[in-house]
Amino acid sequence: MSGLGKRFVEAGYTDLKPFIPVDGKPMVQHVVELFRETNTLFICDQIHSDKLNTICPTSKVFHSVHRGLGPVDAVMCAESVISDEEEVIVSYCDYGTQWDYKTFLADVREHLAEGAIACYKGFHPHHLGPDCYAYVRENDKWVNEVREKTPFTTDKMNEYASNGTYYFRTGRIMKEYFKSLMETGESLNGEYYVSMAYNHMIAKGMRVRVFEIEKMLQWGTPYDLEVYKMWSAYFHEKPRRRLRMPGITLLPMAGQGNRFRMQGYDTPKPFLPIRGQMMAVAALRDLPETDSTTVISLKSHAVGQYFPGCKIVELAETTNGQATTCMAALDDVDDNTPLTVTACDNGAMYDPDRLENLMNDGSVDVIVWCFTNNPTGKLYPHMYAWLDVDDSDSIREVSIKKPFATKPNTHAIIGTMFFRKAGVFKAAYKHIVDHDLRTNGEFYVDNLLQPLIEQGYSVKAFPVDYYLCWGTPNDYRTFLYWDDYHSSSH
C-alpha cells in the first residue's frame, strides 16, 4: 500500500485508493477479509495507520516511504519484521475475490508447494478490455513461467491470470527470491512485481502452484472500479413501480442471431434465460405496460406460447431491417395510436416519475431511451447509435454505428423508443425507404430519427439509470457473471 494511487487522484477521488468505499466499506477491508488472519502486516505511508488499526485491530503497520520501485521493493523495506519461518502471503490492496481461503491453504500445503498464485481463467468481464495482468503458463496446475502485463497467447481469457494473491511457504524463501529479482534488475517500467520472483524460484527447481478462484473483482483503475460499482448498485436496487402507458408496444425479434450461433449457442437469442425467464420476456417486463403488445417473430420460432395475451405476427423470413419488421405489424394500427418500439435483448432500470413527466408533455413527439454509463459503449462504440443532446435533452443529431468524431459520445441508444403517434413512425419509415437511408445495408429504427429531427419534430433523449445489454455473447456473459456473483452468498 505504498503507492500513490495517482490514477484515482487524477480521476477526482479524494480518498486514498485503499480507503475508497466499495459496497459500504473500504477497498482494503475487502482484501483483509479474504484471508481472515490476525497476523497482518500493512506496508504503507504513516498517514494510513489509524484507519488500518480500525479495519484490522490485530494488525501491525510498517511505515515505508514511497520510492516508486513497486511492491517487491516495498515488501523488502519491511523484511526485518517478517518471519523467516512462517508462511507468507503477499497481497495487493485493490481487488476482490470469490474463493475458499481454507481450500487454498489446504491445496498448497497438501502439494508441498514452495509458492502459489491465486489465478482465474475463462470469462471474466474486465478481460474484455485492453488491460493485461500477470499471466501463468502451467502444466497440471504447476507453474512453468510467469509473464507480467503480457499474455502468452492471443487468447488471454484462456490463460491463468493472477488476482494479486501470492503465497510463499516461508518468509525466507520470499526474501531470497525477491532479492534475486532485484539484483538482476528485472523490472517493468521501473517497478519490481511479485509475480516475477516465481520465475527465479522455478529456475532453482522450486514448485509453484496455481490455485483457481471463482470470481475476480478488478478495482485497480478508476474505470474498473466504476464498472464494478455500477453492477453492484443495480443488483442492490429495489424494484421500481411499473408505469402504465397508452398505446401499443412492438417487440421485433425476427433476426437470425448470427453472433450467438457462431459462438456455439443452439438456442435463439430471444429464448436465452435471464434470471429465470426468457430474454425477450425479461425485456418486456422492464418496460412500461401498454394497452397491448405485438410480438413480431420468425414463423419457425413459434413464440406464441411464451407471450400469452400478446398479438403474434409471424414472418416467413428475415426482413431488410428492424424498421421493416415493425412495419409488418402496423397496417391495422391507427395513425394516432401511441407506439413504443423496443428490442428483445436488453433490460433497463429507470426513473418512472421522470418518464411519466416526459410522457405527459404533449409537445414531445419522440422519446429515445439511452444510456450514459454502461461499459459496453466504451468496449464496442461502433455497435451503437450515438446522440448529440442539448441541455434540455433534445436530440440535435444521431450518428449510427459510428461515434462522433468532434462531439462527446455521452448518450447511446438502447433500442427502446416512444412515438406519440404511430403515423409519425410510418411516415418516417416511408422517408428512409424513399431516400434509401440504411445502415449496414438495413433499415434500422434508428434511421428514422435524423429525418424527424430535420423535419422539426421534438425528439427527446431519456437516459435510463441502468442499461442491461444482452445483445452480444460477451454482453450476455457479462450480465450472467455479475448476476451469479451478486446472487451467491459471497
Which sequence ranges carry the predicted segments?
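A structural signal for short hydrophobic beta-strand segments in well-ordered beta-sheet cores
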Residues: F19, Y135-E138, V210, F271, ...
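Alpha-helical elements of Rossmann-like donor-binding domains used by nucleotide-donor carbohydrate transfer enzymes
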Residues: M76-C77, T103-F104, A197, V227, ...
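Conserved alpha/beta core of the MobA/IspD/sugar-nucleotide pyrophosphorylase nucleotidyltransferase superfamily
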Residues: E159-T249, D335, T410-H490
